[in-house]
Amino acid sequence: YVNKDYLSTKMIDLPYAVKLKKRKHNKKYDYSNNNIDRSNHTYLDYLSYMHKNPNCNVWQLDFLGTIKSDSKSILSFILPNVHFTIIDIIKNPNSQKVVNFFDQLEEKIGTENFIELIPVILTDRDPCFTDIEGICFSKITGEERCKLFFCDPYVSNQKPHVENINKQLRKFFPKGKSIDNLSKKDILNKNLTLLNTPIKSLDSNTPIDAFKTVYGEDLFYKIFDVVNDKQK
């Protein structure tokens, strides 16, 4: 974007950047999906929106790569400011099942909470993320519940936080090992283990602690369908 003069910043203002080698694009997957109209949903649109709404929560969305023979895939969804990650396992994933994931999340936490907590989603051009209307609009109200933006093709570093989480998830889901034997309950347990791990950048607090502090305990328990001990 600097090279193409989309931004006022020039390369001479970025002394570290000129030392970097040009990034090679990974073309293992074809995420171009040229038949999809992403007008107003591009990465440049995302930058423009965030310039106008700098304090907006931005969640990053991705699928963790699995072996080709698997019928199941793991969806990872992260809120970087508190390192809060929601993961789910989806059999034979497609765009409708991704929409179902967000519909179910909205049903759990309520439309008002969804709009406040998840105003912006940034993802790649995976074919499963192409139902823009289904993701962005509430099945309950028919109104817009979030904004969805796509990274440029083959530029995974535009959503670095979810890429980093995917690396951490490899501790639970090693490359080359099938996940088809895992259930939703297995994934929930691993998700909670990840969220209960202290993180240095959170002053050695856990993502669960950070999320509860910023967004409240009730919202956390609604997301994971867990009974709050204080409410028993």
Q: Where in this protein do the model-derived segments appear?
A:
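Secondary-structure boundary/capping micro-motif
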Residues: Y1-N164, Q168-S178, L182-S183, N189-L192, ...
